C-alpha cells in the first residue's frame, strides 16, 4: 500500500515512549494538512499510534503498514496534522 507524506521521521531502535514523543514534536511542527511518515522497529508502536491518534485532537492516523527490510520488520505509521 502506498501513502502520500510530506516528511519522514526515522525512530528505528527507539523504544516506547520515544517514537510517540518524537512524533508528537515533529507533527506539531508541520503545516496543517501535512502527513508525517514514521518508521519504527518497536512492535508496540502499532497500538501506541492507534491510541494516541484516537485521543489527540490535532492528528489523524491515515494509515499503518508493516514492511520487511533485510529480515527486520518495520512498522510504518502515517499521521496527518488536522489542526
Where are these regions (language model features)?
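Residues within well-formed alpha-helices
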Residues: 22-25, 39, 52
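Generic structural detector for well-ordered beta-strands
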Residues: 10, 39, 78-80
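An N-terminal amphipathic alpha-helical segment
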Residues: 2-32
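C-terminal structural segments of small proteins and small subunits
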Residues: 50-83
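Hydrophobic side chains in well-ordered alpha-helices
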Residues: 19, 48-49
Amino acid at each position: 500500500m502506498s501513502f502520500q507524506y510530506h516528511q519522514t521521521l526515522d525512530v528505528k531502535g527507539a523504544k516506547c515512549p520515544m517514537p510517540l514523543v518524537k512524533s508528537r514534536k515533529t507533527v506539531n511542527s508541520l503545516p496543517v494538512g501535512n502527513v508525517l511518515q514514521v518508521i519504527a522497529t518497536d512492535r508496540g508502536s502499532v497500538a501506541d499510534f492507534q491510541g494516541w491518534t484516537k485521543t489527540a485532537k490535532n492528528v489523524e492516523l491515515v494509515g499503518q503498514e508493516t514492511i520487511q527490510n533485510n529480515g527486520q520488520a518495520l512498522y510504518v505509521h502515517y499521521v496527518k496534522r488536522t489542526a
